[in-house]
Amino acid sequence: MLEVKFYDTADDSLLKFAVIISKSDNKWVFCKHKERNTLEVPGGHREHGESILDTAKRELYEETGAIVYTIEPVCIYSVIGKTRANDTGEESYGMLYFAKITEFESQLHSEIEKVFKLDELPTEWTYPLIQPQLIKEAERRGFL
């Protein structure tokens, strides 16, 4: 079982992931990875020497093609338990962001096959025990 926790602050060195809840034209923005049949919120791993905000901006561009947007931090989150991105099960930390995308590049240049703009949240999630909780927390904090 996974446990998701939320924090207002944490040491920057702990932040290994950025996840970006995104909307465009009042629709949810989700990605479909080429190797999966599920949908996910844009996000990914922080690269060495990269700020966590730069991670979020890079991942948002790579996974959605977003080129004009606003982005703001929501909170820090952690996940305890084994996941596709963490096989040790130890607590891992990330920064949750919210972005409003106003313009997309015409082609994707990543492992993402397709970007979806949805009126409703999906039913088939890549990370069903994590990402719905991140969205609920962003909602609770007044971002959605």
Language model features with spans:
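Acidic, metal-coordinating catalytic segment for phosphate/diphosphate chemistry
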Residues: M1-V19
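Short connector loops at helix/strand junctions that flank enzyme active sites
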Residues: L15-F17, K23, K34-R36, V41, ...
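A structural signal for short, well-ordered beta-strand segments
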Residues: I20, P73, Y97-A99
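Conserved Nudix-box catalytic region and its N-terminal flanking loop in Nudix hydrolases
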Residues: K23-E62
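Short helix-loop capping/hinge motifs at secondary-structure junctions, enriched
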Residues: W28-V29, E103-L108
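A short coil-to-beta-strand element that immediately follows conserved catalytic motifs
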Residues: I67-I76
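Active-site-adjacent beta-strand/loop module that shapes the phosphate/pyrophosphate-binding cleft
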Residues: Y77-E105
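NUDIX/MutT-family hydrolases
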Residues: L96, S106-R141
